[in-house]
Amino acid sequence: MQGIDVSYSDEVGFLTKGDRDWEDWIMQLLLMAKKEIGKDNAQEMSINFVDEDRSQAINRDYRDKDRPTDVISFAIEDGDDGLDLAMFTQDPDFTEDIGDLFMCPSVIERHSKEYGTGFDREFGYTIVHGYLHLNCYDHIEPDEAKEMFGIQGKVLEEYGLPLYPDQLDEGRGK
């Protein structure tokens, strides 16, 4: 399995908080999720850490929701154009640009308190959730949700950040 090239933009100084190597921690989760969904080709993406004002502006402008949110994903390939990436992935030099994540650490922190999950688990949930969206997973329909949340649950469990039992199929709710 080839890796993921992640470029970062950190408008809020998140990556330098504490003594954790956040980039390494994030990469471990991303690679586990990549393996779980069977993506062998090289990928690239960006992760942008933003404040609540920027998160709200993006959410309002692109999703018509006038509130800050934990993560917003902009997938390059949404699976709706009929393009078969398989013909490209056989090329050893092909790197799939999967898109961009905009993450708001202060909203993630607030969610961790609201849901009683702790920051690490909530952050892990959010990064894996966003990554799956960039890889054309969604949770609009019940069968899609079951698949997506099942993958999230497995990755987080293996990493030591388990979900609540009912989150494996239903999402975040307790």
Curated annotation (Swiss-Prot):
Main localization (coarse): cytoplasm
Cofactor(s) named in the record: Zn(2+)
The keyword Cytoplasm appears for this protein: yes
Domain of life, per lineage: Bacteria
A family per Pfam: YbeY
GO cellular component, one term: cytoplasm
The keyword Metal-binding is annotated on this UniProt entry: yes
Localization in the cell: Cytoplasm
Record-listed E.C. numbers: 3.1.-.-
Residue ranges of coiled coil: none
GO biological-process terms attached to the record: rRNA processing
MF terms (GO), sorted A to Z: metalloendopeptidase activity; RNA endonuclease activity; zinc ion binding
Membership in a protein family: Belongs to the endoribonuclease YbeY family.
Function: Single strand-specific metallo-endoribonuclease involved in late-stage 70S ribosome quality control and in maturation of the 3' terminus of the 16S rRNA.
Protein name: Endoribonuclease YbeY
